């Protein structure tokens, strides 16, 4: 039997935990587990139910359910007045979070112990196998779990999430602490000591296995020389108490260090969406996907951002000055460093350390993990899961030739032949604007992405498909807002009249597109589009 705990451990109100509460409530129903959470969530359950949308089920990968289905889940609630009292005594939310991460709290420990005692009395023949905890657990709960000899499994989304376009959601989870590399480092050393005899997959293969459809064309520029020296990936909050209480480090330290070595023109910055919301800055002018931004710089630095994993995946230099993530011990500490993450570790981290969504909340899986399987056994179980779930070619287990494996992986995803050939050629002898690195085109309702090559200051989009076209919709910016105009379009070598699209117009994020008029096509469609781009700021300045 497992217990699932959902508590508010950040600078958010308790209501913000409602999504995780509902997700865990469903897992508890399906597995016969017990849930511990805030009293507030129980009191406001009807309101929470009313706010449920199909988007919630999609984002958190849950099946739809109604209140009647989960009413018999055994739940225990921490009184709101207790947290309110402790926070009032501390004087601020920051000091409260520091206290919860630094050490114990007698009042909370008494409540946690009382709940565990009640559970043990109610289930005398069912030992508590473990406690799942969303995000880093408070020290009072850790203290009580340790006294009762119950392991805590802390978990958080990794940088790879299926609702964001990746092929699987992977979780970072372990029996120790989420935001340090101690347990991961031990697992890595064990893995190295084992006779694994496993194939190593290249960066581009790993992207072909896990990556988004929209970013596959960017593989073609992975080996290109970046334009900038360093990217700074900002956190959602100015201070992260669970980090600062141990490392005494935050984003301000990163900016301070970067200013010593780099000019502003050598740096790029990407803020967390939570930070943008707090500053009332629209997310529309920030790309949903950061891959092109990552590729634009030689290295990336962060305090604690999971996005650092994407830098390693895209073969850029990840810099983590402090021990704040599971893989930080393998990252450079120096923001001027040139060392990339070794490929064998990247394979280990993706296939062995991170846990696929379908296994993350499986009691059978975690009971198996508690039998201390070898790291190689964990790696193989995860890899077998991906082969089945993602319909990967089993030849990737034995085929020694990397280009052959890579081509097979692309085919298994349903990539079109032109894209496969482009990526196999591995050419990158052209200029690119990382702000408009790729565009999307929909032909007969199916989306395709290609790079935009810069020639004489104009972006050129080219695609060849082995099918006739009944409809063509062109999304120049795709996942970011801005302004665009068409310079010229041809289909199968025949010019298309785009005079109506010759002026700059605003392109909303995601939905902004041109529906193109075109001549009838045969059994093959070749599309060439030349277009210009202006940021919203440039457009407004030009028309002010």
Cite the ranges covered by each PLM segment.
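Short beta-strand-plus-loop segments that form exposed binding edges in beta-rich domains
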Residues: 474-481, 533-534
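Active-site and donor-binding regions of nucleotide-sugar-utilizing enzymes
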Residues: 18-24, 64-181
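Nucleotide-activated donor-dependent transferases that construct or modify glycoconjugates
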Residues: 1-12, 235
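Donor nucleotide-activated moiety binding/catalytic core segment of transferases
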Residues: 111-115, 263-318
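Active-site donor-nucleotide binding/catalytic segment of nucleotide-sugar enzymes
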Residues: 217-275, 351-352, 356, 364
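Catalytic donor nucleotide-activated moiety binding site of glycosyltransferases and closely related
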Residues: 84-102, 234, 252-287
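Extracellular carbohydrate recognition and processing domains
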Residues: 444-467, 501-512
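Leloir-type glycosyltransferase catalytic cores
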Residues: 172-219, 330-429
